[in-house]
Amino acid sequence: MSIKKISEIQPESFEFSKSNSHEAEKEIKKYPKDRKASAVMALLYLVQKQNDNWIPLAAIKYVANLLCIPYIQVYEVVTFYTMFNLSPVGKYFVQVCTTTPCMLRGAKKIVDICKKNISKNQNELSENKICSWVEVECLGACVNAPMMQINQDYFEDLDESKTNEIIQTLLKDKLPKAGSAKNRKNTAPEKGKTTLLEVKNA
């Protein structure tokens, strides 16, 4: 179970938007009627995506009612998985990988930029309330270190200049282009592929 701060300020109610309600129905239909509780992760993902990256208690009750399961069962899922947030993190949620490969390639400088421009401490909203940051463990993109995740997108091969540019763009309420800051194609070498040169689109 992860340690999470539950927001003291909670909305009185929650319900899916029309499009997310349709998506929720599609997820639920993937399972037999007596197993629709299996859709809980997918529905919580939709909640968080709709609600600026966090899940209010009213939404937990809403999902429990949709799936016809006890409130505590959904609450257990939300508090177990670190990708679910129980307090506001802003429209743009920055997760900085500080595991060994990223640290060796400059993640500390990325953290310093977040401290300077977003908030002094982790899990605190920026002055304009649209952005927050946190250090996380490996995000599985070690070959593109250092990197960070913003909402659902990866920003890779970062340096101080590019990181600062990205953060400033977020604070202006704009989402910058995701991917490699060095325009690498996936995990290919920076100067292009060095093997399988005779194979097209290898």
How would you describe each model-predicted region?
Residues M1-A202:
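Signature of N-terminal electron-transfer/Fe-S-associated modules in redox systems
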